[in-house]
Regions:
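Short hydrophobic beta-strand element within catalytic cores of glycosyltransferases
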Residues: 276-281
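A short, glycine/small-residue-rich beta-strand->loop->alpha-helix junction that serves as a flexible
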Residues: 8-25, 50, 199-201
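Short beta-strand->alpha-helix junction loop in the catalytic core
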Residues: 112-114, 155-156, 166-181, 219-220, ...
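Short alpha-helical segment that forms part of, or immediately flanks, the ligand-binding pocket
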Residues: 245-246, 268-273
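Conserved catalytic-core segment of nucleotide-activated headgroup transferases in glycan assembly
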Residues: 176-179, 184-230, 236-241
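Membrane-proximal helix-turn-helix segments that form the acceptor-binding/catalytic region
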Residues: 113-151
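A charged, aromatic-enriched C-terminal amphipathic alpha-helix characteristic of glycosyltransferases
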Residues: 295-301, 309-344
């Protein structure tokens, strides 16, 4: 038996972000196509969430949470021949790093150096809590040890410049299943936000606005406690992947998706799919002709005012441009084939 270990940070029914969604798609669509799939094991390098249920993982997939039994992790990694990382942490994990000679493929969902650069370049972000532990120097060294690096974003990245050899781009995919027309709720001025609390996602720009937030309430409270942002006009809902559909049907029409250095932007695709008008960052898919782009809090506030002034036809024209760009990523079969090829080398 030639054991191969897949490493990730989260998956199953406890989805916390786009990387977890990507991992779930890999396990559902790619893992069953791998040769001798029973030889592939899943190491979830985190604590087991209280609400995690194994039934949401593919039947027959052997899996293990690192903190359930660290010794089991060591045994797996010691016995295996290959390690493929579906989604890595952004800092040193000694129990993984010890086996660097077995590293084969790493899928990169965000480039740590770009995350740090985005925070450092914008004074207001430097004052906010940085939710994710990041060590850019180590992360670059970590990426360099793999035989292959796969960038899953649709946006360009300097990672490819830093690691030009055996680094490939296989963008994520998104299937449009709702295809709702642009809602007229845009006119009520309410704004939605459905993502993790990270400094680069600028949830604080919703201060002085009204609407709804779907996220981890603990992280949001930390932001409030450590800043002057009260977000008192926003109604907050605890993140649960099962609540997302109903959240996106609420009576708001504008969606805050102006995240800095967003690699793929799964929630931006979701906003368009649900007929919401996203405000996006100037650095996201800049090749697309789209009017509602910002890079500061002031620009965000002015953009909301502009949206409310614009006609419904003007808004529809813009969201149509955005969706035409997004549709080219709506090809699951092509994605499966490319990811399978990438991991098999």
């Amino acid at each position: 038996m030639s054991i191969k270990v897949l490493v990730t940070t989260g998956c199953g029914n406890t989805v916390m972000g786009g990387a977890d969604i990507w991992t779930n798609y890999f396990l559902e669509l790619v893992w069953p196509t791998l040769p001798v799939k029973r030889d592939w094991r899943l190491l979830i390098d985190s604590k087991r969430p209280a609400s995690f249920e194994s039934k949401y993982l593919p039947k027959g997939l052997v899996h293990h949470f690192h903190y359930d039994d660290p010794e089991k992790t060591r045994t797996w990694l010691d016995e295996c021949e290959e390690i493929h990382v579906l989604h890595p942490h952004y800092h040193l994990r000694p129990h993984i790093w010890h086996f660097e000679d077995k590293f084969k493929t790493v899928f990169v969902h965000a480039y740590a150096r770009e995350m740090d650069a985005a925070i450092s370049a914008i004074p207001e972000l430097k004052r906010l809590q940085y939710n994710t532990q990041v060590d850019s120097d180590f992360y670059d060294e970590y990426l360099a040890t793999f035989n292959r690096r796969i960038w899953v974003g649709n946006n360009t990245t300097t990672m490819i410049d830093e690691h030009p050899n055996y680094t490939y781009n296989v963008p994520n995919f998104y299937e449009f299943k709702n295809n709702l027309p642009l809602t007229t709720h845009v006119d009520n001025g309410k704004i939605g936000f459905a993502s993790r609390i990270e400094s680069r996602k600028c949830v604080h720009w919703l201060n002085d606005h009204k609407g709804y937030i779907l996220t981890n309430q603990f992280d949001l409270q930390n932001l409030k406690d450590s800043s002057t942002y009260s977000l008192k006009g926003m109604e907050v809902f605890q993140w649960d992947v099962n609540h997302h559909h109903f959240f996106m049907l609420k009576n708001f029409g504008i969606f805050h998706a102006a995240y800095f250095k967003e690699p793929f932007g799964y929630s931006i695709f979701q906003a368009v799919d649900y007929g919401k008008l996203p405000i996006i960052n100037k650095d996201w898919a800049p090749e697309v002709e789209y009017k509602y782009r910002v890079s500061t809090k002031n620009e965000f506030d002015e953009c909301v005012k502009q949206i409310l002034k614009d006609s419904h036809e003007e808004r529809v024209t813009n969201i149509k441009n955005l969706k035409e760009y997004m549709i080219k990523f709506d090809n699951k079969d092509v994605w499966i084939d490319k990811i399978r090829t990438a991991i098999l080398g």
